[in-house]
Amino acid sequence: MGSSGFSWTLPDHPKLPKGKSVAVVVLDGWGEANPDQYNCIHVAQTPVMDSLKNGAPEKWRLVKAHGTAVGLPSDDDMGNSEVGHNALGAGRIFAQGAKLVDQALASGKIYDGDGFNYIKESFESGTLHLIGLLSDGGVHSRLDQLQLLLKGVSERGAKKIRVHILTDGRDVLDGSSIGFVETLENDLLELRAKGVDAQIASGGGRMYVTMDRYENDWDVVKRGWDAQVLGEAPYKFKSALEAVKTLRAQPKANDQYLPPFVIVDDSGNAVGPVLDGDAVVTINFRADRMVMLAKALEYADFDNFDRVRVPKIRYAGMLQYDGELKLPSRYLVSPPEIDRTSGEYLVKNGIRTFACSETVKFGHVTFFWNGNRSGYFDATKEEYVEVPSDSGITFNVAPNMKALEIAEKARDALLSGKFDQVRVNLPNGDMVGHTGDIEATVVACKAADEAVKIILDAVEQVGGIYLVTADHGNAEDMVKRNKSGKPLLDKNDRIQILTSHTLQPVPVAIGGPGLHPGVKFRNDIQTPGLANVAATVMNLHGFEAPADYEQTLIEVADN
């Protein structure tokens, strides 16, 4: 903060002592919903979480993890791991990706910035390529934003536009890709009627083409590069609608894993490879699954796969995807400026911190928790440990994931006496839940519960405190439902599996031998959310939170 009166020093809490080890456990994708056969958390054997829920009602609360509570535009917007961990770590609610883009599009500000002026220089003689997820899921992108952007760029001089689509089926229903393609094709038809050469150029399923994250599998990005940039793919079609319908008809096909395809003209030539002088915009507002493509598009020194041909382009992201790497260096909408996170405060007040997860969620307990900031605040007081995730398989094949390894590292960190806070993310409920495999998700929830036990046992041994929470829902509801709550059926009378996050609240549980006996959850916060957790954790460490943080969830009763 710029004011001369600012201090990083946190005041002592008047009633809570310092010096207790605090374990912060985030169960990814672990919401609270009605118990039925499609609630994998309910079906699974989860004795530890059950005991927290049923043990002491004053030590268990549900908080909001979606919509306005995490900075998203409306309460119809599902939470996600990025905004969830931002809120958990920042202690305040910041306007997030989708909301920032909405504001910039509505005001026209998106067209005034350096990023747009940079790509605009290619409009006269080059092609504008838009690459991203074609979906209204609102987690990575939104169709209406693409529609507004197409209108805006065409009104501001873009003469030739190529859209490279990635089908969803993860944050929206499988099969919805066909409707999204039809909508986009109609919009492009209207642009062509106005003299703009606009069409879909390539496509593929999000989990198989382009949208890998945390450098788990560069082949995913390469398949996208080949189709989008080189105009080469194993499947060639005259239209995207034909492509999606044909590829979905293959055995076991689904939107998430459609193979890459390119659209070709009557001569069999790809209609939209990226060439020298073109402009490229990656339209997703969520960062994690765009970073790898951004590196391939922007870095001159790049050896993760053979790009074959590296066109001289003007590239901008919808947002900047990594603030520490300054990637991409150009972007259409500035990211939220998250300052004074709880992690930075606590480290500056002497709290030695250990953070751990496996690859798929490691960035969440570090980068996103710390306000979209890479690296340490103070390397002498922090240690971040990444357990490598399984690669080359879908997570339902090995639903235990690395929960045991994460828990053991957390246990060892607690028992070592070197750390005041041990923070972990257990990804099972979310990552396996996304596969839509109910049986595997039940196993995943059991594994996460067993991991929590290992950590809480260590808390018990060191006389510490625990706070167990989640970042959003997923595993607690695996089916699409009608307004009355009954599962929806498809045309073959089979339940429609839900692979996305949910709008459900998530738990916050506190306890441990080090917890002051008078601590209990307050009842005077009207709509508690994830952002209230940061002040709560600060209290557990014996500090008062900054005045502008969302209120703590706890109070101390006088005995």
From Swiss-Prot:
Main location: cytoplasm
Catalytic activity, reaction form: (2R)-2-phosphoglycerate = (2R)-3-phosphoglycerate
InterPro entries the UniProt entry points to: Alkaline_phosphatase_core_sf, BPG-indep_PGM_N, Metalloenzyme, PGAM_B_sf, Pgm_bpd_ind
Entry cofactors: Mn(2+)
Descriptive protein name: 2,3-bisphosphoglycerate-independent phosphoglycerate mutase
UniProt binding sites for substrate: H140, R170, D171, R206, R213, R286, A287, D288, R289, K361
Species per Swiss-Prot/TrEMBL record: Zea mays (Maize)
Entry GO CC: cytoplasm
Reported tissue expression: Found ubiquitously in germinating seed.
Origin organism lineage: Eukaryota, Viridiplantae, Streptophyta, Embryophyta, Tracheophyta
